[in-house]
A protein has these predicted regions:
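Short beta-strand-loop/turn "lid" adjacent to the catalytic site in phosphate-handling enzymes
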Residues: 72-119, 124, 128-137, 154, ...
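Short beta-strand scaffold segments in enzyme catalytic cores
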Residues: 35-39, 154-156, 161-167
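ATP-dependent carbohydrate kinase catalytic cores
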Residues: 116-147, 239-260, 265
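A short, charged helix-loop
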Residues: 179-202
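Solvent-exposed alpha-helices and their adjacent loops that cap or buttress functional pockets
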Residues: 19, 30, 143-149, 154-157, ...
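ATP-binding/phosphotransfer module of carbohydrate and carboxylate kinases, centering on a glycine-rich
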Residues: 6-7, 12-77, 170, 194-341
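A short alpha->loop->secondary-structure connector
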Residues: 134-138, 170-183
Length: 341
């Protein structure tokens, strides 16, 4: 039961289809920045989504308000839903990590009249989407040969830093385990990283991989670099930082390189700890913008160099998944699989 691009995967369709299987499911992807909704159905083995909408989280005081806007705008009256939320989920409830929203499945059922709602971690959905994608959605970062029966790590920085482990169960079924792996402590490995980490420890306290590599931590990392390099702090965008790095600005080049090495070191740690020789799949907007930095020799070394165990990850492939709607696909696949139990 290998993952794409080597093995089989259900294809994804966003229009049309026949052989309807099951009732439509409202799916949502709720991150620290945006809220995405769509209606999902599985037809003939394909997950199909329609009525897609992307809303800014800042425009709403609560998740329920965003959901109400979507339902009003589309006129849909779904009875089943699965929402992927960026935060730890317990007993059908979640407090978002990077937004002050508390969401309860029971409360939403009472307010909106759903028959059932499943709330899952956003990276549970991201991970569950991986086997639903064909090889066209994947870009190779590090070549290798996966061992199909072993776990896969799915991770990546966006606003935060999501992490999940994907286990093949056979018969096209998958188990996803999530925690808060992005909050594992950051491990500096060279002099500059120790200097930056020292500043972050003084200003932020606990220094996690999420703080170093994700969107929410970029401002703090930028401040630390300015202090270490003796530069004045400027209010500039991530795009401008990248532009300056491309133009030869050493500080911004080193800043992006440190974040890329943090990503590769983190997923290497996770693969090592989980025996995840099924491969690593990266996702998230930050990752897509630093692909060239992820391929640098020093980033590759962070993934593979493990002292006496350096050979362990030598053939473990790393791929980047390109699909902004992946969590919606994964939420639908998760709901369908759980409903069939």
């Amino acid at each position: 039961q290998a993952l794409p691009p080597m093995g089989r995967a259900s294809s994804i369709s966003r229009t049309g289809g026949t052989d309807r299987m099951g009732e439509p499911v409202l799916v949502g992807d709720v991150g620290g920045t945006n809220v995405r909704f769509a209606l999902a159905e599985r037809r003939g083995g394909k997950v199909e989504i329609s009525d897609f909408s992307k809303l800014s989280g800042d425009s709403f005081e609560t998740f329920a308000a965003a959901l109400r806007r979507y339902l009003q705008d589309t006129g849909l009256e779904p009875k089943h839903a699965c929402f992927a939320m960026a935060g730890p989920v317990r007993d059908g409830e979640v407090m978002l990590t990077n937004r002050d929203w508390h969401v309860s499945a029971r409360h939403l059922c009472e307010v909106f009249g759903f028959d059932d709602i499943k709330i899952i971690n956003d990276f549970t959905a991201m991970a569950r989407s991986v086997p639903e994608h064909s090889g066209d959605y994947f870009e190779e970062i590090l070549p290798g040969k996966e061992i199909p029966e072993l776990p896969v790590i799915v991770a990546g920085p966006g606003t935060g830093f999501g992490v999940a482990s994907l286990f093949p169960l056979g018969d096209d079924a998958w188990q996803v385990l999530t925690g808060e792996g992005g909050h594992i402590a950051y491990a500096p490995r060279d002099a500059l990283e120790f200097d930056i980490a020292s500043v972050l420890m003084r200003t932020q306290g606990y220094v996690s991989n999420e703080l170093v590599a994700s969107g929410m931590g970029l401002e703090f990392v930028h401040r630390a670099f300015c202090e270490v390099f003796g530069r004045n702090l400027e209010d500039i965008s991530p795009e401008e930082m990248r532009h300056r790095a491309d133009e030869g600005d050493e500080m911004f080049d080193q800043l992006i390189a440190m974040r890329a090495k943090a990503v590769m070191g983190a997923v290497g740690d996770l693969a090592l700890a989980n025996g995840a020789l099924g491969g690593v799949v990266l996702a998230g907007g930050v990752t897509e913008r630093i692909v060239d930095y992820l391929r640098r020799p020093e980033s590759v070394a962070r993934f593979r160099e493990r002292g006496p165990m350096s050979g362990y990850l030598a053939n473990c492939p790393v791929r980047l998944m390109h699909d902004p709607e992946a969590p919606l696909i994964g939420a639908a696949a998760y709901y369908a699989q759980e409903t069939l139990k």
